[in-house]
Amino acid sequence: MLNFFAAAPKGFEYSLAQELTEFGATEIKESVAGVYFTAPLALAYRITLWTRLASRIVLVIYKGPCESAEQLYNAAYCIDWSAHFSNRNTFSIDFHGTGGFINNTQFGALKIKDAIVDRFRDDGDARPNVARIDADIKIDAHFRNGVITIAMNFSGPSLHQRGYRSTTGEAPLKENLAANMLVRSGWKAAPTTLLDPFCGSGTVLIEAALMAADIAPGLQRSRFGFEHWRRHDKATWHEILEEAKARASLGVKRCDVKFYGSDIDSRLVALAKRNAQNAGVFELIDFKVANALNVEPPAAEGYLITNPPYGERLGSVSELLQLYYQLGDKFKKEFGGWKVAMLCSDIELISALKLKADKQMKMFNGALECAFNLYTLHAQSTRRDTPVLPEGVDIADIAPAFANRIKKNAKQLEKWAKKEGIDSYRLYDADIPEYNVAVDRYLDHIVVQEYMAPASIPEAVTKRRLSDVLLALPAAIGVDPHKITMKTRERQKGTNQYQKLDERKLELITTEYGAKFKLNLTGYLDTGLFLDHRLTRRLVGQKSKGRRVLNLFSYTGSASVHAALGGAKSVTTVDMSNTYLAWAKENFALNDLSGKQYEFVQADCLQWIRDSAHDKSAQYDLIFIDPPTFSNSKRMEDSFDVQRDHVNLLGMLIKLLSPNGEIVFSNNKRKFKMDTDTLVKMKIKVENIDDLTLPMDYKRNPHIHNTWLITHA
C-alpha cells in the first residue's frame, strides 16, 4: 500500500473524501484543503485518471517531526531517491510553509535539494540536475506545526485541466469546482435533465455530461507526474487507460440524460460548443444563444445548476440585483418541480432572488469565497395577476417604506431643482433609519452611498436592506438600473475622500446656478462636487465681485469657479492634490475662465498658510476654507483635527485677511463647537450662517455641515 494526499480547493474535503471512499481507497483522513488516503498502485492510477474533484495527487514519501535545518536535511537524505527516479531525470522542489528555523520557502527547498543530490553522490551516482520549469520529477514539501511532509507529485499538472478547453481565454469556473457543484447539488447521485442558462464556456454542462457518459475526466490529459517515476507500471497504467476509453465509447452511446445550455453571448456559446466537441460530449448537449430571462424549462422537472454573473466588471450592482430578482421571480413562476443550485460570491445578489434556500454551503472559486445555495421550487397553483413594474420590480414587495419616501421626495424636489437652476441634488438621506443610505441625483444618474451600519446590526441584515434599496429605486423614481452607481461611505478617516475607488470613469457635466462642473461618479468616493455646499458656493460667488479671493482645501475648485464667475479680481486655488488641481483647471475651462488672475497652487494647505502668514503682502479680501474633519496624510507634516486646531487655523488666516475682508469657514464635523470666547479675545468676530447655507434638499439633515462668517473685530 502507498500513502497519498489528494489536494483540492478549500471546502472540497467532504466531497473528495466521499469520492475516494467510492473508489475503494482506505485510511481516508480529511485535512485542510485535501484528504490523506492509502491505495495500491493500480488504484492510485485509477483515482488519478477518474477523480473529478482533486487538484493534485501526491505520493507521500516521508512525514515526521522537524525542528532544525539539520533534521530537515536528514529527513530528505534518508529517502532512497534512486528508487524513485534516475540521476538522468531532472527534478524540482516546491516548498510550502515557514516558521521556527525556516524563515523562507527558498531555504527549505535548498536544504532538500542538497540532501537529494548528496544522497545520489553518496550512493555512487552522478547528481541529477534541477530544472525549475518542466522537471521530470516534482517534489512537494510541506512544513507545518513542526512536521515536514515530503512527497512526489504523482498526478502532474493540476487535474482540473481536463484538456478539452480550446482556448486559454477567460475561464472563471474551474472544472473541478463545476464537478463539486454537481456533486453537492445532488445531481450526480441521480442524473436527470440539466439546464444552465448562464453556461458561458460550458464547464458545468460538460462536466455533467462526462459524468453521465462515464467518461474519465483525465482521459484527454497528455501528461502525468508518475511517467518518469521508477516504480511506474506501464502495463497496469495502459490497461486502466484502455478500460477508460472503452467505457467512454459505450457511455456516450448509452447516455439518455438531456443537457441544455444557453448564454446571451454568442461568442461564449460558440466556445462552449468547441469545448464540448473536444470533450466528446457535443452530441449530448443542446446549446443556444438566449437571454436567461427568456429560457423556458425544457422538462417538467430537472436541475438548474449555474454560476450566474457577479462582480462589477459584468455590470452595475443595481443591474445585477435586477437580474437576480427577475430570475427568482421567473423560477417561482415557471420552474415549479425543479431544483436550483446557484454559485455566487455576493450575498446581496443571492438575497435578491427572494427564494428560501434548502441548504447553504461555502465554496471557493480560486481565492474568491462563494455561496452555493440549493433551492427546491414548488409548482404554483396561481400566478400573480398584478402588473409588474419596470425591470420586474413590484414596489409593493420591495422596501415599500423606502420606495414611497423617495418617490415623494423626488416629486417635491424635481420642481424645486428646475426653479433653482440645478440638476444635481440629494433625494434621500437616511430618512428611514432601516435604510441607511444617501441617494443623490446627478442629471439622469443616481449615486447611492451606504453609510456604515452600527456594529449591533448583523451584516446579513444590512446587506439585505441595501439590496432592497437598489431593487426598489428604478421603479420608484424611474431610473435605468445601469445608471445607478453604488458606493460605501464610512466615517471620514484621514484622506478617505481622496482615495481612488476604481479605474473606470463615468463623467458628466452638471450645472449649478449657471456654473458648469465636471463630475466623476465612479472614480472616487466623492463625485467632485459636495452638494451640501451648493449655497455656500453661491454665497462665495455673490461676495466675490472686485475682491481678491483665496480658496483653501479647494478640492475640485468649484467655489473658485463661482468666485471667478462672480467677478473676483483674482482667485487663488490651493490644494495638496495635483489630481484635484487639474480637475479644478478643467472646471475653469468648462466655464471659459482663463487668465493670470487665476492661480492654482499645489501645497500642503496648513504649511502654505503658515508660510503666507509671515508675508505681509499676501492679503485677501475673501477667504473660503472647508478643511477636512481630520487628516493625517503622509504628504502633510502634521495631523489635523478641525475641533482641536480651528482656533490656531483661524488665528493664522486672519493675518491673511484684509481689514474689511471676510472668511467663510465651513466643516462637516457634526458636533463641532466654535471656541468663540478664545476667538473674541483674539479680536476675531464670528457669526454662524448655517441658515443661509443649508439647501432645501438637506433640510432633513441639518447637521450635514456648519458654516461661519469670520471678520476682524
From Swiss-Prot:
> What are this entry's molecular-function GO terms?
23S rRNA (guanine(2445)-N(2))-methyltransferase activity; RNA binding; rRNA (guanine-N7-)-methyltransferase activity
EC assignment: the record states 2.1.1.173, 2.1.1.264
Catalyses:
guanosine(2445) in 23S rRNA + S-adenosyl-L-methionine = N(2)-methylguanosine(2445) in 23S rRNA + S-adenosyl-L-homocysteine + H(+); guanosine(2069) in 23S rRNA + S-adenosyl-L-methionine = N(2)-methylguanosine(2069) in 23S rRNA + S-adenosyl-L-homocysteine + H(+)
Q: What keywords is this UniProt entry annotated with?
A: Cytoplasm, Methyltransferase, RNA-binding, rRNA processing, S-adenosyl-L-methionine, Transferase
Main localization, broad class? cytoplasm
Gene3D superfamilies assigned to the protein according to its UniProt record, in alphabetical order: 3.30.2130.30, RNA methyltransferase domain (HRMD) like, Vaccinia Virus protein VP39
SUPFAM superfamilies for the chain: S-adenosyl-L-methionine-dependent methyltransferases
Q: What top-level branch of life does the organism fall under? A: Bacteria
Query: What cellular component GO annotations does this protein have?
Result: cytoplasm
SMART domains given for it? THUMP (SM00981)
Compartments where found = Cytoplasm
- Pinpoint the THUMP domain residues: 43-154
| Pfam families, per the entry | Methyltrans_SAM, RlmL_1st, THUMP, UPF0020
Function according to Swiss-Prot or TrEMBL = Specifically methylates the guanine in position 2445 (m2G2445) and the guanine in position 2069 (m7G2069) of 23S rRNA.
User: Into which family does the record put it?
Assistant: Belongs to the methyltransferase superfamily. RlmKL family.
The entry's protein name is Ribosomal RNA large subunit methyltransferase K/L
- Taxonomic lineage: Bacteria, Pseudomonadati, Pseudomonadota, Gammaproteobacteria, Alteromonadales
Gene that this polypeptide is encoded by: rlmL
